[in-house]
Amino acid sequence: MDYGRARIGLAIADAVAGLPQPLGVLVRINRNEDMRRLREMVREHGVKRIVVGLPLRLDGTRGEMAQEAERFAQRVQKQIGVPVEMVDERLTSWEAERLLEEFAGRIIHAQTPLGAKRESLKKKQKKKEEGKNSVDAIAAAVILREYLEGQRTNEKRGVEA
């Protein structure tokens, strides 16, 4: 999960293949409703462990958002009953934006007909919001990838997580 005050980016990985995939974005409503919807998703997808990104500052210290994310992770574990682990998420949103731009650039280039008209302002605003949602979900997949790579490294070293 990529925790945010307005949205929570979600990703999932198959236990066998371990390939993280963006799942979507949970638009925040309130604590109770957010937990209800997360509980439903956890049940629907058979989630055995939840990974929440810890937004540390670049110097590694915990700021306000990191403290919020920690409290959120504690609530998730208590209310949903699935083990929760936190992973340093520094620069994951930046990486997600880079991946999205790279991927979107390929799609737009391939699909835009020559001489296409400019989009209306409403369409641009809608795409911008969809882009934010995509970035949050991709950031969650990047966080999950970091966690899984750390697990694999520990397994190779013979260290238990």
Where are these regions (language model features)?
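Two-metal-ion RNase H-like nuclease active-site motif
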Residues: 1-2
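Phosphate- and other anionic-substrate recognition elements at nucleic-acid/protein interfaces
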Residues: 5-161
